[in-house]
């Protein structure tokens, strides 16, 4: 399953920080950012992606995050 999120992460350093935090909690997920996309995309791939938990981690670090419809 792949879930795509729209974020407001613009800086590569913040993206790396969030990736470290997300990978610490979800080591079996494949996670990456596409900061060149206008929606600052966060892609998460895993057997069962916990969208609300991903949003909580990103939001808890001061960024907007929502599932891209």
Residue ranges and their predicted role:
Residues 9-25:
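Short amphipathic alpha-helix segments
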Residues 46-51:
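Helix N-cap motif at beta-to-alpha junctions
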Residues 18-22, 54-61:
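Short amphipathic alpha-helices in soluble, non-transmembrane regions
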Residues 27-30:
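Gly/Ser-centered flexible loop/linker motifs
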Residues 32-33, 62-69:
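Conserved short beta-strand edge segments in small beta-sheet-based binding/regulatory domains
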Residues 40-44:
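A generic structural motif
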């Amino acid at each position: 399953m792949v879930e795509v999120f729209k974020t407001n992460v613009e800086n590569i350093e913040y993206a790396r920080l969030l990736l470290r935090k997300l990978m610490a909690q979800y080591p079996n997920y494949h996670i990456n950012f596409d900061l060149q996309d206008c929606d600052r995309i966060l892609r998460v791939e895993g057997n069962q992606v916990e969208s609300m938990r991903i949003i909580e981690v990103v939001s808890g670090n001061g960024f907007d995050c929502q599932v891209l419809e």
